[in-house]
Amino acid sequence: MKMKKWLAPVVLTAVAAASITGCGAGTEESSGGTPLKDAKAAAEDTTPVTIQYWHSHAEAQMPGLNYMLEEFAKKYPYIKVEPVFQGAYTDLHKKLQAAVAANDVPAVTNVEVSALPNFADSGVFADLGPFIKRDNIDMNDFSKGMLAAYAFNNKQYGFPLIVSTSVFVYNKTMLDKLGVKPPQTWAEIDEFNKKVTVKEGGQTSRYAFSVPGWDTWYYDPWISNGGGSILTEDKKAAAFDKPESLRWAQNFKKWMDEGSMHMGYGKGASDNMRQMFLQEKVAMVQHTSAVLKTYLENAKFEVGVSFIPGDKKRESHIGGAGIVMMDKAPENQKEAAWKFVKFMTSAEHNIKWAEGTGYLPTHKSVVSSEQGKAYFTKLPQYKAVFDNFDNVAPRLQHPGYPEFSKIYMEVVGKMILENADPTPLLKDSVKKINEVLADYK
């Protein structure tokens, strides 16, 4: 598979490294060339070691991270973890590329979910499979979709760490007064719109709902829920010339033309949508679950949460970042790195981590624990997500996604800003997307 220019330094370095270290044969190996029998011995090794953890945790997440680091140090006093903040995800990814090219990588790092395929495809992340098998990790305790988001080509490269999904945040006080509930299916949306939308002088003064137009992450699940797809099943061509792959956009255009649906696009769109909701100019907004506390703390009315409505299927997509091991980390750091990854994503501290960061728990078992019960008593709004735990799915996994997703996002922008018909524009986008895909064949 041909890689794009932005990953060229990574690929060249990885290939060069493989030509040097990849000549051994005849031994079952774990990731990075360590024989499994040596890995088992390493599991018992208590020789002091220091590892770096590169991350993008915002300041608000630091209490949660500091708690985890303190607990990890208690359990593994011989492993010193140095957390290194590397900025936003895009900055972190650029620094990872440079680190791989310089052959000087951290042992553990965050990776934003949509970037994982590109890095994994270039061979820079360690395959966690041998460690998972050795330590009998209960993979069934994770959400299926959350795990799938950090797997690529049938290998598990990471675990979900700071996980969000898009949900509908709604004005429960308003909807209760109107005697309506958030739509659970597309078939219920028209009736919901009629009862909630308010117009004055031909202009909408209160929208029924809002969907962000500034990020494809928000409308990708609408594509799949409508029975469509972004790419064909073999991922070799765009699918926006198929009727089922156009339904989402055609419905968006219809609901916008009727004045019931609002979409934000461009600079300041997220803040504007949030303010519209708080000012009761829109009854329901699709937003990341990571900002739920912001709505709860600022709304002067009761806030509810609903899973996004479905049609042919019903799913929402994973957001946030996972935690991975770098394949070319020094051999003496790999066991410590695995212990850290396993600890950070274990069920034992999952609720404390979620509370400290504002992101979602990732284990099914914690829901029924005492900590879990207290968590859902405090934040009952999250129950809508956990009622659909296995319907939280990975977004489309393709190394070219960051590039070709911009093409159909531009179509949405024209629909919002220029009132353009999205159907011919999406059909025209097929050729452009296919040109991008050609670089990955």
Where are the regions a protein language model picked out?
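Short, low-complexity disordered leader/linker segments with a strong preference
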Residues: M1-I51, K74, P424-K427, K431-K441
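Hinge/lid segment of periplasmic solute-binding proteins
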Residues: K37-A39, A43-E44, V113-S166, D190-N193, ...
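Short, polar/charged alpha-helical segment
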Residues: K37-A43, A58-K80, I407-Y408, L426
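Short, well-ordered beta-strand elements
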Residues: D38, T46-A58, I79-V84, A107-V108, ...
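Extracytoplasmic "Venus flytrap"/periplasmic binding protein-like
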Residues: E70-F142, A149, T173-Q184, M276, ...
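Extracytoplasmic/periplasmic substrate-recognition and gating elements
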Residues: E70-K75, K80, K177-L178, Q250, ...
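Long, aromatic- and glycine/proline-rich binding clefts that accommodate carbohydrate-like moieties
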Residues: G145-A149, V303-S306, E355-K414, D439-Y440
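Glycine-centered hinge/linker elements that transmit conformational signals in sensory
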Residues: F192-K195, K235-G266
